[in-house]
Curated annotation (Swiss-Prot):
Lineage per the UniProt record: Eukaryota, Metazoa, Ecdysozoa, Nematoda, Chromadorea
Lumenal side: 28-389
Pathway linked to the protein: Protein modification; protein glycosylation
Known EC number: 2.4.1.122
Cofactor: Mn(2+)
Single GO term (MF): glycoprotein-N-acetylgalactosamine 3-beta-galactosyltransferase activity
Pfam families: Fringe (PF02434)
Binding sites annotated in the UniProt record for UDP: 155-157, 163, 186, 329-330
Enzyme superclass (EC): transferase
This protein's name: Glycoprotein-N-acetylgalactosamine 3-beta-galactosyltransferase 1
Amino acid sequence: MANWPRVSPLAYVALGVLLGLTISIISQTGTTTYDAASRIAILRANRGDPQVDEHDHAHGNDPHGDEEVDDHHANFAPVQFHSNNSSHSHDGESLIADEVAKKVRVFCWILTGKQNHDKRAKHVKATWAKRCNKYVFMSSEEDAELPAINLNVSEGRDYLWAKTKGAFKYIYDHHLNDYDWFLKADDDTYVVMENLRFMLLAHSPDEPIHFGCKFKPFTQGGYHSGGAGYVLSREALKKFIEVALPDKSLCSQNHGGAEDAEMGKCLEKVGVKAGDSRDADGHHRFMPFVPEHHLSPGHVDPKFWFWQYTYYPMDQGPTCCSDYAVSFHYVNPNLMYVLEYLIYHLKPFGIDRAIRVPKNETIIHTAYSISRSERGQDDAFRDRPEVAV
């Protein structure tokens, strides 16, 4: 009989650990690249919902679903940045933006709920909302500090359409003639207001048009994602309230439904165009997810529903997004302040990004000319002649 060498018990332990690690690594291979898509697959399996449903597409199947917006630790006081009041500060850099803000007056309404006043809404107020010409939060509870309006509509996804109708009716009744454009955003949307106005400057508020992240199901000409925010011209708001909303053959009278899709259906039936919000090079300006989702190559499964929904092709990676991006969605309060810092406070020393205004032009005319040159290729009013500004 052969004399086999005696194996130490420790060797068996080491072999077991090594085998376990190997199995663990193999089992994880191929899953990390599309981590978001994996979570969605699990979600669909648990819900028995393999298809994208018209009344649920904007939420349950998102890689950054509402329940994943990490605002559990957001009950901190609004953050105030330093004033940058030094010889190398940003002082004087907003002259053009300030002039455009006088010309393109945007009323912002932010959809929220009483449970989110302290977790989200106050951080929206402390960051981008202050750059609207005027803003208000639409909720189920009044809050003079925000301020928030009580729409007397129940909370929950099943009532988003009712809230949206009520919010636009309130704005029509109180602010129609005081502003040019009317932006709807969520309390986890981050908006670069200067870039929104820059895009809108090429258009007249008398055009029946709305802009946002354009999706293609459910309508002929497209509709706009609710989470990325969408903006209606004054004429679009008038048509929605005066013509579409009172007519049950044009607008759903129910309280439920996908708010963004229902809005798109109503507007299309009264001749309001779903505009092309891309820049002249085809880069997108309204983003329905956080920056990481769009900027990181391979972040999301190519079979993910978004790629079938988007009206215009969108690259995944650094070429996705316009240098004049307008919005991102699923932005938690911490990320909101990070974006605020990166956009409005951080600057590379020695790099001058000033826009040169010719001596024979006004600031607003120069901005208008650049805005027209940056319009999307599918612009609904592209043939509209240049007007005096």
